[in-house]
Amino acid sequence: MAAVDDDLGVSVVVCAYTEKRWMLTRAALDSALHQSPRPQQVLLVVDHNADLAARARRELTGVTVLESDGTPGLSGARNTGLKAATQPVTVFLDDDAEARPGWLESLVQPYSSPDVVATGGSVHPRWPGRRLRWLPPEFDWVVGCSYRGLPETVSVVRNPIGASMSLRTSLALEAGGFDDAVGRVGTSPRGCEETELAIRLTASRPGSVIFYVPAAAVDHHVSADRLRFGYFVSRCWHEGLSKADVVRMVGSSAGLERERRHTAVVIPAALMRELRSLAGGDAGAGMRMAATITGLSTVVAGYFTGRARLTGRSRKPSRSPLTGSIRPAVRSAAAPEE
């Protein structure tokens, strides 16, 4: 297999934190190594787990194993990979995702335009059994996957899905990398670290864009613990809290742009669809309607709870975990001060 063109070389980064996912992590790495064209560099960043790092060094070939030197959590691990990347484009693949053939080629193709600062691919759930009957497709983001409401063709978006995304390495480093004040730590269902960085990237470079490329597809393993309705509610709650963090950092215009459309257009259409299905005798439609209303209400409650917790706090300038320097506040026409 030929490598990706040197002018657009690629470093693939997989971040892992537990040996419980060892077989999935190996599958993720293998899927990256067997892309055609292949990446010039594949990195496994281990998030503060010495036993996992030692095992990876013993058993893996063709992969550079690094231990995270950042704050514990996904953002710190991703920053470690970003700093170690030697290629112009850094691609992030989740440790429980497997890239399909053609994934890498499709993901980096938009970089032929200098205005492209990041790309993201489609993420498809791989269920341990049947798909959850009660889960509305508009809420597949709860299990880390693409959801109904996203574009079905190559389109400009605000931010990619973290399970399968790429960034121009130098620009991401210049922007200060991922903010370790947001994002997952272990099994914590927080998120939005890629959203916050994506907004900073485009705000710092007028005219820059991020593309969603559905053909760059990965399969995301859905673990058994994510099949519970309790997880669904918890994930929605923490999404609301995370959105409050992002809005504090970048303003509500940019921080809630996509969410407003999803709430005003996609969710009402989903409820109408399920209402018609219920009238047609689909008993599962009632469960999906209930989940839709519960999910939306929980996200909103989490968001306003997060905002209330932040009320009265001074907005301290964000400090880059990569350089220690103060990041400029993101306040532009796209993200006005509230």
Regions found by a protein language model. Give the residues of each.
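N-proximal low-complexity "stem/linker" segments adjacent to membrane-targeting elements
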Residues: M1-S31
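Short, acidic, metal-binding catalytic loop of nucleotide-sugar glycosyltransferases
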Residues: L29-P39
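Glycine-rich, basic loop-to-helix element that forms the pyrophosphate-binding segment
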Residues: S68-A85
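Short aromatic/hydrophobic "clamp" motif used to bind/position activated sugar donors
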Residues: T90
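Conserved donor NDP-sugar-binding/catalytic core segment of glycosyltransferases
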Residues: G102-L135
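Short, flexible, basic/aromatic active-site loop/helix in glycosyltransferases
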Residues: G121, E138-V157
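A short, conserved alpha-helix in the catalytic core of glycosyltransferases
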Residues: G162-L167, L171-A175, V182-A216
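Non-catalytic, C-terminal membrane-associated alpha-helical segments of glycosyltransferases
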Residues: R235-H238, S252-E338
